[in-house]
Amino acid sequence: MSKNSELYFFIGLRIKQARTNTFGHRLMTQTELAKALNVSFQQIQKYEKATNKISIEKLDKIAQYTKKPLAYFLPHTVVDSTTISG
């Protein structure tokens, strides 16, 4: 599995986890989340299975809707100490 595939697999898993609690009880359905994002429930399925890549904008909307920080959906990464200035 490529790094890119692993990333989207991780994101998909986190989307599903955000919809359900650790005991598997439903917090929201794919349909409910889809309506909030103005996409089909099939699109949510594809995000969760990493069949389709999700944009950062959609991921941010999922984070807002599920009340999770955006970082929750991304694997832990370490950024070097180099300062980037604009």
Regions found by a protein language model. Give the residues of each.
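Short, charged recognition helix plus adjacent turn
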Residues: M1-S2, L74-G86
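Short basic helix-loop element that most often maps to the first helix and adjoining turn
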Residues: L13-E32, A36
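Helix-turn-helix DNA-binding elements, focusing on the entry/boundary residues of the two helices
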Residues: Q30, F41, I56-L59
